[in-house]
Amino acid sequence: MKLHNDYRLLTPRINRDKQSFLARVIITLKTSFSLDLFSGLKTALGAFFSPKVTIHYPLESAPLSPRYRAIHKLQRLLESENERCIGCGLCEKICTSNCIRIITDKGEDGRKKILNYSINFGRCIYCGLCAEVCPELAIVHGDLVENASTQRAFFGFKPQLLEHKSSLLEFGGFGSISVNADERVKTTPLSYCTQDSQNMLSESAPQENTNV
């Protein structure tokens, strides 16, 4: 029976009680040996013989990338062991979560002195913009991923964020300079002009000697 707007009436579903035994057996066999069943079994058997991907946390931990973005660290200079941070405030300005706050003042020697450097980890989204924009590689991301605790002693202030002097090594994580950074440096136009002038001087030197 055809209705308006190309709608059709579906045939009424036969009640299971009214079906014959043979019809129910046929329906059961079709459902049991359909392609959907074998595709599901294929996926289950493939996962059964594949290497396990689950870990027993917290007894085990997944390996992290060297450039993983976790809890921040404040770096020191390798030579003088002084803080790398110069208080420029670029990390505070670029922070999209507005979780970094820097308070600076003028020291006795006339240089800028950092009075307070705080990061609200409750608002931080670990985007890494602060580490990218830092001109002195003063703030980087470490590998401490577990930052939830019920004890106040677990949390700290700026002295706890600073890298300890006994473990001063060149940082290679997120925000650091790449290994081949020197090879990827592009020369400036001024260096090209200097090279051209040196080449011209080297070419003119033999001509002057021959004239003499």
Swiss-Prot record:
The protein's required cofactors: [4Fe-4S] cluster
Subunit description: NDH-1 is composed of 14 different subunits. Subunits NuoA, H, J, K, L, M, N constitute the membrane sector of the complex.
Its membrane topology: Peripheral membrane protein
Location within or outside the cell: Cell inner membrane
Family: Belongs to the complex I 23 kDa subunit family.
Name of protein: NADH-quinone oxidoreductase subunit I
Role description: NDH-1 shuttles electrons from NADH, via FMN and iron-sulfur (Fe-S) centers, to quinones in the respiratory chain. The immediate electron acceptor for the enzyme in this species is believed to be ubiquinone. Couples the redox reaction to proton translocation (for every two electrons transferred, four hydrogen ions are translocated across the cytoplasmic membrane), and thus conserves the redox energy in a proton gradient.
Organism the protein comes from: Helicobacter hepaticus (strain ATCC 51449 / 3B1)
HAMAP family: NDH1_NuoI
Chief localization: membrane
Matching InterPro entries: 4Fe4S_Fe-S-bd (IPR017896), 4Fe4S_Fe_S_CS (IPR017900), NADH_quinone_OxRdtase_chainI (IPR010226)
Residue ranges constituting the 4Fe-4S ferredoxin-type domain according to the UniProt record: 76-105, 115-144
Pfam families membership: Fer4_7 (PF12838)
E.C. numbers: 7.1.1.-
SUPFAM superfamilies: alpha-helical ferredoxin
A GO cellular component annotation in the UniProt record: plasma membrane
Family annotation (PROSITE patterns): 4FE4S_FER_1 (PS00198), 4FE4S_FER_2 (PS51379)
Reaction catalyzed: a quinone + NADH + 5 H(+)(in) = a quinol + NAD(+) + 4 H(+)(out)
One GO-annotated biological process of the protein: aerobic respiration
Binding, [4Fe-4S] cluster 1: 85, 88, 91, 134
Superkingdom: Bacteria
One annotated GO molecular function: iron ion binding
Residues binding [4Fe-4S] cluster 2, per UniProt: 95, 124, 127, 130
Keywords: 4Fe-4S, Cell inner membrane, Cell membrane, Iron, Iron-sulfur, Membrane, Metal-binding, NAD, Quinone, Repeat, Translocase, Ubiquinone
Cofactor note: Binds 2 [4Fe-4S] clusters per subunit.
